[in-house]
Structure formats: C-alpha cells, structure tokens
C-alpha cells in the first residue's frame, strides 16, 4: 500500500485503508484526486465509520464532517472577526467566531474524519486556508482534536467539473 501511495496511484477501494493507516495511525493529512462521481466522498465516510467502530462516540454528534469548500465562504473555514464588549477594559475586543459545524472538532477526544471536499473547485484563497488547516491542524487559531483525521478530495482537471490549479503545497499532501 505505501508504494502505491508514494506513486500517487491507488484505487477507490484502497482509499479507506490509506486513511486508516496514514491518517488515523500516523496523523498525516491526506489528499485524494479522482474523476467526479466515482465515490471518493462515500469511501471516505466509510473510513470514518470503520475508524470509530470499536470506540464509544456516543457523546459526539458525528464522526464525519463533509465540508465542501467550493460552496462555502472563506470565513466558514478561517473564522470571522466579531467585535465584543470587553468588561475588563470597558472597551471592545475582537474574537474569532467559527461556524457551529466546527465546534465539535475542537473538543479533545473527538474522533472522526474531516473531509475538505471539492478542494480542486475552491478558489486559491480558500485553498490557502485549507492548506494551513491540512498542515497545521488549526482552524481560526484553534487546534483541533488529535484524534481527527483531515482528508482533502478533489476532481482531476478534465473530468468535467470546474477546477482550479491546486496550489503546489495542497497538491503534494
């Protein structure tokens, strides 16, 4: 399996194994490309179920977050600065607000897969935020659970969908 990964060629059937070995066990972020409609997202969701089948996740809402970058605003991934009253200084301070979808992954012990889907259809500004997340495991300045696996997925150019050139650091995950 490892030779196939380093050659960047695995089949759709091998996605779950790659996630479980390289993502869950070794804490690597992974990137998968393929033609549109071949089942990348479904296989990645199956990997989340396989990853959590022997542990109690009853306190979690989900073990799989499917975040489709091309449909979301940049602030949905990086956060939005919001002014708040600061009672200590009688002034205003800025805090970063994150969408509710992310709150669970900041809880230590959350176990599952975060899929940054449609990555190749995301604009370069969204890709750069996604790269920071894939690389540093930080969203809006907050570290995510050590048990979370981050996976990027995108369509190959020429597969019929809208695609942007992936930033080199994102493409090389």
Where are these regions (language model features)?
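AAA+ P-loop NTPase catalytic core and its hallmark functional loops
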Residues: 2-173
């Amino acid at each position: 399996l490892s030779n196939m990964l380093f050659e960047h060629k695995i089949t759709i059937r091998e996605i779950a194994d790659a996630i479980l070995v390289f993502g869950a066990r070794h804490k690597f972020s992974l990137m998968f490309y393929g033609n549109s409609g071949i089942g990348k997202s479904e296989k990645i969701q199956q990997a989340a179920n396989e990853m959590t089948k022997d542990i109690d996740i009853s306190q979690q809402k989900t073990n799989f977050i499917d975040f489709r970058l091309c449909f979301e605003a940049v602030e949905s991934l990086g956060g939005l600065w919001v002014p708040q009253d600061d009672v200590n200084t009688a002034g205003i301070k800025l805090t970063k607000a994150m969408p509710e979808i992310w709150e669970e992954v900041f809880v230590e012990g959350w176990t599952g897969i975060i899929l940054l889907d449609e990555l190749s259809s995301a604009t370069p500004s969204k890709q750069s935020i996604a790269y920071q997340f894939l690389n540093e495991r930080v969203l809006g300045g907050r570290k995510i659970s050590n048990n979370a696996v981050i996976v990027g997925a995108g369509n190959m150019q020429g597969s019929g969908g809208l695609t942007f050139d992936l930033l080199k650091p994102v493409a090389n995950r």
